[in-house]
């Protein structure tokens, strides 16, 4: 849980910085560089023109994933950390590697992302939920909660993960039941 909490703290700091700059007219070179870095990491297309910053997309992506939701999903995906994938690859979420980016080190599970640490696995997972096109509806639902001034919780978000599993809603129901226990 400390890794999830620290990841969310870093995201919150970036989000708060973005919110504080949203109506700023003048940008220093350091601020522009920071904004460019954030946009790149969150896969947000931006021309570099500070008058045309895609604020809605940025704020939709630069946001937390509820800690208890990430912990529940890690437990479900890794068999409470006992799976071969978790033990050998530090991969708690069953994240597959992309074509051409797979390394097949001895003792590792082939075809799946390998992480140097659990912290790196958590970071990659949170980034995936915040950037991958498949989770766009998840991010839009979270943004709607923000707009309605409601808290972003695991209870509110687990069922918003459309397309996360080939099992569909039954997997979301499984996660929700696991979270409730």
Where do the protein language model's features map onto the residues?
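Catalytic cores of secreted/periplasmic lytic hydrolases that degrade extracellular macromolecules
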Residues: 1-72, 76-181
């Amino acid at each position: 849980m400390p890794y999830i909490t620290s990841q969310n703290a870093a995201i919150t700091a970036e989000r708060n910085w973005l919110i504080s700059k949203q109506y700023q007219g003048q940008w220093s070179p350091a601020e522009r560089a920071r904004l460019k870095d954030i946009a790149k990491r969150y896969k947000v297309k931006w021309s570099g023109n500070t008058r045309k910053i895609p604020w809605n997309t940025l704020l939709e992506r630069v946001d937390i994933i509820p800690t208890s939701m990430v912990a529940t999903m890690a437990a479900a995906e890794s068999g409470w950390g006992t799976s071969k994938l978790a033990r050998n690859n530090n991969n708690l979420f069953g994240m597959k590697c992309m074509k051409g980016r797979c390394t097949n080190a001895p003792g590792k599970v082939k075809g799946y992302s390998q992480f140097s640490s659990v912290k790196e696995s958590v970071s990659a997972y949170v980034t995936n939920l915040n950037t991958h096109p498949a989770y766009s509806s998840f991010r839009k639902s979270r943004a709607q909660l923000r707009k309605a001034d409601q808290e972003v919780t695991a209870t509110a978000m687990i069922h918003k993960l459309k397309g996360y599993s080939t099992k569909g809603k039954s997997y979301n129901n499984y996660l929700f039941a696991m979270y409730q226990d």
